[in-house]
């Protein structure tokens, strides 16, 4: 687990998951794309684009994709923990968490919710969903904004297309 400068981080610290080069089974380069190859390396480390934490036994816990990480009020927030909490709310069928531009916080934690059948979106429900997270997770994790949608955009493999959601709510 390394920081933005390629320095190993202490156990328990969140950073980017990286693999020390060279390794016999590791990717060597992008064909005819030296600039793209250079961006994948930070010193002796091949960076994966994934965030994680290493425990004292050497196990790495995946936190999220680096491009999914939300930076809000100085905190780096992986959407997974917030989404898991949102899915435990009785009115939520599906949820995605994204960061939207915010002048004060850099990014505003935003929950995009697909309500369960028969549940009508409302400002009161949005407040209740926000309070649900606020009482279960750290204060900086709760969504300052809750949006409702009929469906979340997904790839063919079922992954949430966060870039499409960010584009939808920043226009």
Sequence positions of predicted segments:
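FAD-site-proximal beta/loop scaffold in flavoenzymes
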Residues: 44
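Hydrophobic alpha-helical segments, especially N-terminal targeting/anchoring helices
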Residues: 2-3, 11, 48, 54, ...
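AMP-binding/adenylate-forming catalytic core of the ANL superfamily
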Residues: 21-23, 28-29, 36, 51-141, ...
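General small-molecule cofactor/ligand-binding pocket signal
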Residues: 146-149
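Adenylate-forming AMP-binding core of the ANL superfamily, especially NRPS adenylation
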Residues: 1-32, 40
